[in-house]
């Protein structure tokens, strides 16, 4: 069934444009509130947000929708996405909502939904919500005496800080570690520096002054250049880069080199396997993870199960097949022993634990494999279905034949933007670049011709 509102990570778009309008947000609140409201009992929803200016607008619209449906609302304020999932369980809420567009620019925003177990909603429930939004909302409204109330929650970030700190083994501290944290002017700007400092680290914080429009602006996990420079400047042991809602993380070693999610997953997988903590016989990653990671795991008799792009699909596979480590190259890392979704801070703490335990620099700990040459490029489209175009199909088939068994080709539409993502990898760097550029050229040409 074609989706009109939900993408791979909730509902997302430009603020004040369809579908990220106050009207739609209110209807989402009404529909979700009706579905999760417990008849005859007090029902509650927790709502968090990142630091985008439009968060205020959408927050108020959601409050109107949920209270109209008869649910009480707990407002958490600016807080990481994984904290919303955790607090949904901790506060025994019936539903959790995060207002965020993750790593996107400030002018975008989104709505992510979590069930009472802290996991993202199923496709079936999302389709049910879409159908309700499109119809008459009147039947979903509560009676006069059952309209909900709203209140702001105090101390919620401290609950999450304590939760995150407890994931670091008690016999390990961060004493003597100089850490630079890039908060992306986003939702982690309070919790990440506080947790690291309380665990003993010397913390130097950058991009921790959100003003509503500077979230992810030339900073955070999608723009780590500033962090690389700062680590070198202050001679830090490690840099930690979060994204706007702090559900993903990249590290920078003491030499100023970026360490992506694939390397981080390799560290955790090897460490947890050695201590018999790794479940499922391996880890779960997406089709975008590097072939080098797959080879590294295979050499240690560990498997790499691949899914579609999107941490929700990683989590679904983990739950269905008994894995406790999964993630994406982009830095979404899910450790189900601790969390139900990607958590940048907790993932970083697990890497720091390995480094402290082994008494080795981050550069030694996190260089587990030599990545296979990989190139990812995006091409913006003007609508339609370019991947069904005959010339595009022919170019893709030709590329697969040229790569043969020595590489991989992944082509997919973005779930959040009007883009086609083209990724190829293989041992021959020149061939990889040629394959990607040829496909990009054809898609761009055909898309322009169809416009």
UniProtKB/Swiss-Prot annotation:
CDD domains cross-referenced by the UniProt entry: GlmM
InterPro entries: A-D-PHexomutase_a/b/a-I (IPR005844), A-D-PHexomutase_a/b/a-I/II/III (IPR016055), A-D-PHexomutase_a/b/a-II (IPR005845), A-D-PHexomutase_a/b/a-III (IPR005846), A-D-PHexomutase_C (IPR005843), A-D-PHexomutase_C_sf (IPR036900), A-D-PHexomutase_CS (IPR016066), Alpha-D-phosphohexomutase_SF (IPR005841)
Active site: 102 (phosphoserine intermediate)
Top enzyme category: isomerase
GO process terms (BP): carbohydrate metabolic process; peptidoglycan biosynthetic process; UDP-N-acetylglucosamine biosynthetic process
Entry keyword Isomerase: yes
Positions carrying Phosphoserine: 102
Gene Ontology terms for molecular function: magnesium ion binding; phosphoglucosamine mutase activity; phosphomannomutase activity
PTM characteristics: Activated by phosphorylation.
EC number(s) on file: 5.4.2.10
Known cofactor(s): Mg(2+)
Cofactor binding comment, as recorded: Binds 1 Mg(2+) ion per subunit.
Domain of life, per lineage: Bacteria
Binding site for Mg(2+): 102, 243, 245, 247
Cellular compartments per GO CC: cytosol
Keywords, ordered alphabetically: Isomerase, Magnesium, Metal-binding, Phosphoprotein
Reactions catalysed, as given in the entry: alpha-D-glucosamine 1-phosphate = D-glucosamine 6-phosphate
Function: Catalyzes the conversion of glucosamine-6-phosphate to glucosamine-1-phosphate.
Family: Belongs to the phosphohexose mutase family.
Protein name: Phosphoglucosamine mutase
Lineage, opening ranks: Bacteria, Pseudomonadati, Pseudomonadota, Alphaproteobacteria, Hyphomicrobiales
């Amino acid at each position: 069934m074609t989706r009109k509102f939900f993408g791979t990570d909730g509902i997302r778009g430009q603020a004040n444009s369809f579908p990220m309008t106050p009207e739609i947000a209110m209807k989402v609140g009404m529909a979700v509130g009706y579905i999760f409201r417990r008849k005859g009992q007090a029902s509650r929803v927790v709502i968090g947000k990142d630091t985008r200016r439009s968060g205020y607008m959408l927050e108020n619209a959601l409050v109107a929708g949920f209270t109209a449906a008869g649910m009480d609302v707990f407002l958490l304020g600016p807080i990481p996405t994984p904290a919303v999932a955790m607090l949904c369980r901790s506060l025994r809420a019936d539903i959790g909502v995060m207002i965020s567009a993750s790593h996107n620019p400030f002018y975008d925003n989104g709505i992510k939904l979590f069930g009472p177990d802290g996991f993202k909603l199923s496709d079936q429930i999302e389709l049910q919500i879409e159908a309700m939004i499109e119809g008459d909302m009147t039947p979903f409204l509560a009676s006069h005496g059952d309209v909900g109330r709203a209140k702001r929650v105090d101390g919620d970030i401290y609950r999450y800080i304590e939760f995150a700190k407890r994931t670091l083994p008690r016999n390990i501290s961060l004493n003597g570690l100089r850490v630079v944290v890039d908060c992306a002017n986003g939702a982690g700007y309070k919790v990440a520096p506080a947790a690291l400092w309380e665990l003993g680290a010397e913390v130097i914080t950058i991009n921790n002054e959100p003003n509503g429009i500077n979230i992810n602006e030339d900073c955070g996990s999608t723009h780590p250049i500033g962090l690389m420079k700062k680590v070198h400047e202050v001679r830090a042991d490690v840099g930690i880069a979060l994204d706007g809602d702090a559900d993903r993380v990249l590290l920078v070693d003491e030499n100023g080199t970026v360490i992506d999610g694939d390397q981080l997953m390799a560290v955790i997988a090897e460490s947890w396997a050695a201590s018999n903590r790794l479940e499922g016989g391996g880890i779960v990653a997406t089709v975008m993870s590097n072939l080098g990671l797959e080879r590294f795991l295979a050499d240690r008799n560990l498997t790499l199960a691949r899914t579609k792009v999107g941490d929700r699909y990683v989590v679904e596979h983990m739950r269905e097949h008994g894995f406790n480590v999964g993630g994406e190259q982009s830095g979404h890392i899910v450790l189900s022993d601790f969390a139900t979704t990607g958590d940048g801070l907790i993932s970083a703490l697990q890497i720091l634990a390995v480094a402290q335990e082994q008494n080795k620099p981050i550069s030694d700990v996190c260089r587990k494999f030599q990545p296979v040459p990989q190139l990812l490029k995006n091409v913006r489209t003007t609508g339609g279905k370019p991947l069904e175009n005959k010339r595009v199909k022919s170019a893709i088939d030709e590329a697969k034949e040229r790569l043969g068994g020595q590489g991989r080709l992944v082509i997919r539409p973005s779930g959040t933007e009007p883009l086609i993502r083209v990724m190829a990898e293989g041992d021959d760097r020149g061939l990889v670049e040629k394959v990607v550029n040829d496909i990009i050229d054809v898609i761009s040409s055909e898309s322009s011709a169809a416009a």
